[in-house]
Amino acid sequence: MARKCEITGKKTMFGNNVPRKGLAKKKGGAGQHIGVKTKRTFKVNLINKKFFIPELGRSINIKVSANALRSISKVGLDAFLKKNCKKIENFL
């Protein structure tokens, strides 16, 4: 499976490493030398989590991001799925 949150759709992003070294010119240095940028990936913090659904009387396994897991613990799984326009039947 893809490295993607099944609820929020968060996935790996791409960007640059920007090394900032040296003292700024305003502070009397030679500058910060932001010349060499290298590509990098920002990976999602994914967790395989088992949730119990009392209406169905069974558990489901969902690959969810840590950020979504915090939100689920605050408002509950049903409310969070409703907010993100998802249905429990999609995960069975």
Swiss-Prot record:
The cross-references to SUPFAM superfamilies, in alphabetical order and at most eight, read:
L28p-like
A GO BP entry is: translation
Does the entry feature the keyword Lipoprotein, yes or no? no
Q: Where are the transmembrane segments?
A: none
Q: Which GO terms describe its molecular function?
A: structural constituent of ribosome
Any one GO CC term of this protein is: ribonucleoprotein complex
Task: Note the InterPro entries from the entry.
Answer: Ribosomal_bL28, Ribosomal_bL28/bL31-like_sf, Ribosomal_bL28_bact-type, Ribosomal_bL28_sf
- Quote any Pfam family the record assigns: Ribosomal_L28
Keyword Cell inner membrane: yes or no? no
State the disulfide connectivity.
Answer: none
- Keyword annotations for this protein? Ribonucleoprotein, Ribosomal protein
Q: Please give the family membership noted in the entry.
A: Belongs to the bacterial ribosomal protein bL28 family.
Q: What is this protein called?
A: Large ribosomal subunit protein bL28
Organism, scientific name? Borrelia garinii subsp. bavariensis (strain ATCC BAA-2496 / DSM 23469 / PBi) (Borreliella bavariensis)
